[in-house]
């Protein structure tokens, strides 16, 4: 079963310096039907104005992933990390016993556009940690590339959660198939463009909540960038 969630049905908040779409209940947006999917808790699509950002704030017991689409995100945290996150990088922060961090757009004239993703951990109260990797465009072109995984042997950021996160770029005749365990859940988030998933066309900002399926076929992309999550039920 594939359940379509249209882009315009997401929560939305306009704070002036921050414009944010919420795929699931978050902050002032609450929808009891969309509290998460499996152990995926948050997907926020954020646009941060030049010179603005999120001041220092805390998290605990959450796997937090940032995926920058345009502009650059400046990260600083209580573990001593001071990093710039450009497009093409994936950043993972395991909050564990507690971490303080901030994110800013230090550009003078460019908005930073990124996704922030929260996944519930399968181990609580671990030591906080940070990881950042560059994902080459060619590794995502025409196929799904694993970018976050609980398996430390994978060439992806390591998360302490029963979930795998993939990214792909699809255009024209490019296609890929993704095998699913029907006992688990999956989530497809189309960042931009358009894409057919099992014959159903979705557009930028749309999502598919997937359960009881054994295969996803991604095809007929038009400048599509997509995230696919394999999730604990």
Predicted features along the sequence, with ranges:
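Jelly-roll (double-stranded beta-helix
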Residues: 1-233
């Amino acid at each position: 079963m594939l359940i379509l969630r249209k882009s315009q049905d997401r929560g939305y908040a306009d704070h002036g310096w921050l414009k944010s779409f919420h795929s699931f209940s978050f902050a002032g947006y609450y929808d009891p039907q969309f509290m998460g999917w499996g152990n995926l808790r948050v997907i926020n699509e954020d646009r941060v104005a030049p010179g603005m950002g999120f001041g220092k704030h805390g998290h605990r017991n959450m796997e937090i992933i940032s995926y920058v689409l345009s502009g650059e995100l400046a990260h600083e945290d209580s573990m001593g990390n001071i990093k710039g996150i450009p497009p093409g990088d994936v950043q993972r922060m395991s909050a564990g016993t507690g971490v303080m961090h901030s994110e800013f757009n230090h550009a003078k004239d460019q908005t930073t556009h990124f996704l922030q993703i929260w996944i519930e951990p399968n181990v609580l109260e671990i030591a906080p940690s940070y990881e950042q990797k560059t994902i080459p465009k060619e590794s995502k072109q025409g196929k799904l590339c694993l970018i976050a995984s609980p398996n430390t042997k994978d060439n992806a950021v390591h998360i302490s959660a029963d979930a795998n996160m993939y990214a792909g770029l699809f255009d024209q005749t490019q296609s890929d198939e993704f095998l699913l365990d029907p006992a688990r859940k999956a989530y497809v988030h189309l960042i931009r463009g358009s894409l057919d998933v099992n014959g159903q066309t979705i557009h930028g900002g749309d999502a598919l909540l997937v359960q009881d399926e054994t295969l996803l076929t991604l095809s007929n992309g038009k400048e599509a960038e997509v995230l696919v999550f394999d999730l604990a039920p």
